[in-house]
From Swiss-Prot:
Keywords: Acetylation, ATP-binding, DNA replication, DNA-binding, Early protein, G1/S host cell cycle checkpoint dysregulation by virus, Helicase, Host nucleus, Host-virus interaction, Hydrolase, Inhibition of host innate immune response by virus, Inhibition of host interferon signaling pathway by virus, Inhibition of host JAK1 by virus, Interferon antiviral system evasion, Isomerase, Magnesium, Metal-binding, Modulation of host cell cycle by virus, Nucleotide-binding, Oncogene, Phosphoprotein, Viral immunoevasion, Zinc, Zinc-finger
Annotated source species: Squirrel monkey polyomavirus
InterPro entries: DnaJ_domain (IPR001623), Helicase_SF3_DNA-vir (IPR014015), J_dom_sf (IPR036869), Lg_T_Ag_polyomavir (IPR016392), Lg_T_Ag_Polyomavir_C (IPR010932), P-loop_NTPase (IPR027417), T_Ag_DNA-bd (IPR003133), Znf_lg_T-Ag_D1-typ (IPR017910)
Any Pfam family matching the protein: T_Ag_DNA_bind
Protein name: Large T antigen
Residue ranges annotated as motif Nuclear localization signal: 135-142
Annotated cofactor note: DNA helicase activity requires Mg(2+).
Cofactor: Mg(2+)
PROSITE patterns: SF3_HELICASE_1, T_AG_OBD, ZF_LTAG_D1
Zinc fingers classed as T-ag D1-type: ranges: 274-366
Residues where Phosphoserine is found: 110
Localization (cell): Host nucleus
Residues with N-acetylmethionine modification: 1
Amino acid sequence: MDYTLTREESKLLMELLGLPMEQYGNFPLMRKAFLQKCKIMHPDKGGDEQTAKMLISLYKKLESEVKSLNTDDGFSTEEIPTYGSAEWEQWWQTFNEDFDLFCHETFTVSDDEEEGGEKRKHSDEEEPSCSQATPPKKKKTSSAPKDMPELLRNFLSNAILSNKTLTCFLVYTTLEKSSLLYSKLSEKFKPTFISRHKLDNEGLIFLITPSKHRVSAITNFCSNLCSVSFLIVKAVIKEYSCYCALCVEPFVLVVENIPGGLNSDFFDAPQEASKNVSWKLIGEYALSIMCDDLFLLLGLYKEFAVNPSTCSKCDQKVIVDHYKYHSLHYANAMLFTDCKNQKAICQQAVDGVLAFRRVQTAQLTRKQLLAKRFEYHFNKLEQVFSAKSEVCIETYMAGVCWFECLLPEVNMKNFILQYLECVVQNVPKKRFWCFTGPVNTGKTTLAAALLDLCGGKSLNVNMPFDKLNFELGVAIDQFTVVFEDVKGQSENKNLPTGQGISNLDNLRDYLDGAVKVNLEKKHLNKKTQIFPPGIVTANEYIFPLTLKVRFCKIIKFIYQQHLFKSLKKTELLTKHRVLQSGLTLLLLLVFHCDVEDFLSELHPLVTKWRENINHEVSWSRYLEMKENVMNGLNILEKQQDSGIFTQTQDTECQQ
């Protein structure tokens, strides 16, 4: 091999391979280095082409020369005789004559050795005699405690694999390891309080964190530092009692981060506040305003902690949900602000609202549910038209005039009554209306007003079908729904395409309402119910026949320039979203319908608001606003009085 390459070529090759000359001839190592250098020196990898060529040529030359030198050392399998023959025995002896495996050494027999060396046994646990051997890993002592000291068990949680989060923990380990864990826990969790205690040769760490954690989080952090030492971590449920027990014999306090330790006030104040606050009172408030938003309820109730005598919202008397209940809940709100479980209290109150709504859905008829909704709207009118409100009845009556001009040759009063009858009767396969037409023709505006009038939710089905489950789950316990702006295929290239219509075609059981369907929300069990009726709004898309037959009525909207102009000039309607409010349609019904058309329990409210409308808006003023809509003018603009009409006419005789 020394004659395969010259001395200079050998040095150059080893230099290119990045290996010392002592490794020359170590072909496995040289080949590994060669493959690595080829990747580095390849021109495509940014290497030098000439250097790469030099490396490859030298290595190939060495490899070819070495193979040629070793050609005589091998043999062919064809030279081996048949196994078992006399020729094979002779060949086998010749083949092995250079391999002498016999050991010629002699050993002196010791007196301690047993006769027959084959009986000697070596223990697996015998320590190596060589001083350079790796020391064996220490094993955890079998005498390690399996549980917390008995004196402390009454103060600790016995839960196993619990996901509950807490702020107080007790760590039990060796005395030596407790010193390390004390410093590491202080760095990691920035505890409100931490102390280290001693029990014989064992250590305990009492830990209070500023935020809540699972027991597993503390255990996983500490176990990375305890490969040999035993470790037990448990949550503390009686914090002050546990701390006091750790400070008396047989325990010894070693160190704590707060000089003087803790007193009972540190633990008892939040507990006393949570005990004294009335959960029932908060639940009743949420039910009275029908608030199913956890964070809204939390914010509203915190506002009650302000003294009612200095509360600006109570002085203004604009928000009924505030000034009506402030004085009653002031004392309870003061205790509520000191609680650490505010979210849990509000969550229970919100759950009570959802439970009440579900009971109503299960027990009341749809006509009774609609009456409850109308009663809610009548009460809301009191708040909307309060003395300090920016809008008045005339503003909403302007919205009534705009709606009456929305669909030519259609009586809007009869239109709304037919829709109410449709959703109340809820007849299978005759439950959905479809609003279709060009862009900006009022489809969504009317659908939103009807949805607010009856109550319900708007749904988006323009998404992949496998993601619709939770979107449809929004309809749980709702009176009506609106499938808003459903997209599909259209001959109009200006309209975006979508899969909403295809998804609706696959939801026939939902639209028909003949059988119950499964609806689901996150973190809640599936609920089986009849899917609520409602409206589908869409632009000029192509509806398949299988979907058309599931609409009991299809209304085609047309673009009317005077509606667009009048709405643009009457900014008050868009600013306060008058046209999207169910209150506008309710006033339309009160204005045009007889009192007997409503349920008997609503008659006093209907009579009251008919009188209010007649007092605020005369019949002549109503006709004037309607004429402004048809002319594309500001609806609330008053024309010059000609002196012809001098008296206010009652609307009861009209229609």
